[in-house]
Amino acid sequence: MPQYIPIMLNCEGWRIVIVGGGRVAERKVSSLLAGKAEIVVISHKLTPWLKSRHTEGVISWFERGYIEGDLEGARLVFATTDQAAVNEAVIMEATALRIPVNHAGDGEQGSFITPSMIRRGKLIIAVSTSGAGPRIARSLCHEIDKQYGDEYETYIDFISNVRAFIKELVPDGSQRQSLFKLLAEMDILTEIREGNFRPWSEEEITSWISEYREV
């Protein structure tokens, strides 16, 4: 079994080709939308959900089967059809073009697999069994989902915003690290959960930085 390496990709503007228009393709598209990629689906038919995304202009749709040459210019490829020969042809072309490719039915035939995932705004928690037990990964994600609620989106947004100000206003590396540590130790989550939190203004952030940068 391959030994996979976890990685986070910035796919904004990438051409991503998905061959197949069924439920599996639907799941792939759903997970890719947040990345602002140029998503192209090649299939004779689409699920109602995928049709809606096409109508909205979120994805492009080639209403036909896959033909060799469809992968030109792609940065990522997903083979999701229920036809083994088609999936194999997609894998072969992607491999020849050195494009990372995912085989939805048999991960080892492709060059990468996708984990089960929980997203809370900027917070992404990914779980994988390296293809050994996808159902187990989904079950683990379900358990983790119960532990990390929507409050984490607000929390991470707050942390991200304050860190951005620290990076801009504090040139000294050691001072920045001290402020990052203080920020991480603040019990903001409790405030959010109890309904007592409100986002800080720019003035409040700069005041906090000024107060604690020399501590």
Regions found by a protein language model. Give the residues of each.
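Hydrophobic beta-strand scaffold residues
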Residues: 39, 61, 100-101
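Short loop/edge segments at beta-strand edges and connector loops
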Residues: 43, 61-65, 105
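E1/E1-like adenylate-forming module used to activate ubiquitin-like modifiers
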Residues: 103-153
